[in-house]
């Protein structure tokens, strides 16, 4: 678990993953400062913590396809959003992760 997730004491369960979306630039290319309402949700996020994992039909633990620290691509509207101490996080299922960016 990352230091940030440990400090917050957030532990996803099952095949869920705690991520933090990357921040949208607050200034447009022309130098115009964008209000929060004009910013779009980012679909890139950093993996902060992994749940306990999922088991197959035989009870074998299935490995996660991501690791803490990976930058992943998720759907803009997926997961459960939560705000802790003014910071926004999202808990998504492994199946909602579209790709790992390298």
Swiss-Prot record:
Signal peptide: none
InterPro entries: Chaperonin_GroES, Chaperonin_GroES_sf, Chaprnonin_Cpn10_CS, GroES-like_sf
Gene3D superfamilies found in the cross-reference section: GroES chaperonin
Subcellular location: Cytoplasm
Keywords: Chaperone, Cytoplasm, Stress response
Chief location: cytoplasm
GO molecular function: ATP binding; metal ion binding; protein folding chaperone; protein-folding chaperone binding; unfolded protein binding
Any one GO CC term of the record: cytoplasm
GO BP terms in the entry: chaperone cofactor-dependent protein refolding
Record text on subunit structure and interactions: Heptamer of 7 subunits arranged in a ring. Interacts with the chaperonin GroEL.
Family: Belongs to the GroES chaperonin family.
Biological role: Together with the chaperonin GroEL, plays an essential role in assisting protein folding. The GroEL-GroES system forms a nano-cage that allows encapsulation of the non-native substrate proteins and provides a physical environment optimized to promote and accelerate protein folding. GroES binds to the apical surface of the GroEL ring, thereby capping the opening of the GroEL channel.
Record's protein name: Co-chaperonin GroES
